[in-house]
């Protein structure tokens, strides 16, 4: 990664937008000339000490010798950069890196949490059932039972009506 960072920083410096420093200049005036600058930003021209293989081999049992002669005359040798050693195991195979995952809940803790949630939901359902049973029939919608929210809203309305009745009876 270090070797990749330096050419990118250099490219960033060479091709910085000229409009940032000079407001009257065109955005990427003549500094963007990729056809003439390709030798500065080509892939590695010499084999790096970090490469896995010195050059890409195009030889196969079916290739002719004239074909390989043309490849030897190529001015560049494209090399593969070595993977960081953190991604490889002892035998060179790719391994999954540990990113500090949270330890998962044990089966026993999950069961206990599930039981607590069931009991909580059961208690809420029983309380709503009690509210529905104690509401006057005028608040029920006939055959269908009230939903949780409808039950709570009807209960609030019923309590406010009872409160108003009590306040009116105290005045008289």
Curated annotation (Swiss-Prot):
Any single biological process term in GO: cell differentiation
Organism: Xenopus tropicalis
A Pfam family assignment: HLH
Annotated stretches, region: Disordered: 1-69
Biased composition (Polar residues): 18-29
Domain of life where this protein originates: Eukaryota
Cited PANTHER family: IP14615P (PTHR20937), MESOGENIN-1 (PTHR20937:SF4)
Ranges of biased composition (kind: Low complexity): 42-66
A GO molecular-function annotation: DNA-binding transcription factor activity
All residue ranges annotated as the bHLH domain in the record: 108-162
CDD domains hit by this protein: bHLH_TS_Msgn1 (cd18939)
Subcellular location: Nucleus
InterPro entries: bHLH_dom, HLH_DNA-bd_sf, Mesogenin/MesP
Gene3D superfamilies given in the database record: Helix-loop-helix DNA-binding domain
Predominant location category: nucleus
Cellular component, GO annotation: nucleus
Transport listed as a keyword: no
Name the record gives this protein: Mesogenin-1
Keyword list, A-Z: Developmental protein, Differentiation, DNA-binding, Nucleus, Transcription, Transcription regulation
Function, as annotated: Involved in specifying the paraxial, but not dorsal, mesoderm. May regulate the expression of T-box transcription factors required for mesoderm formation and differentiation, such as brachyury T, wnt8, vegt and eomes.
């Amino acid at each position: 990664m270090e070797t990749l960072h330096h050419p990118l920083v250099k490219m960033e410096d060479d091709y910085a937008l000229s409009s940032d420093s000079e407001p009257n200049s065109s955005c990427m005036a003549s500094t963007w000339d990729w056809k003439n600058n390709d030798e500065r930003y080509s892939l590695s021209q010499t084999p790096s000490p970090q490469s896995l293989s010195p050059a890409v081999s195009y030889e196969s049992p079916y290739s002719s010798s004239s074909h390989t002669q043309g490849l030897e005359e190529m001015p560049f040798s494209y090399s593969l950069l070595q993977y960081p050693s953190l991604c490889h195991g002892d035998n060179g195979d790719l391994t999954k890196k540990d990113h500090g995952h949270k330890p998962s809940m044990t089966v026993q803790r999950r069961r206990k949490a599930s039981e607590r949630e069931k009991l909580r939901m059961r208690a809420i359902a029983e309380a709503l059932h009690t509210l529905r049973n104690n509401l006057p029939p005028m608040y029920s919608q006939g055959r269908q039972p009230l939903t949780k929210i409808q039950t709570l809203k009807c209960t609030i309305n019923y309590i406010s009506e009872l409160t108003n009745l009590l306040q009116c009876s105290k005045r008289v």
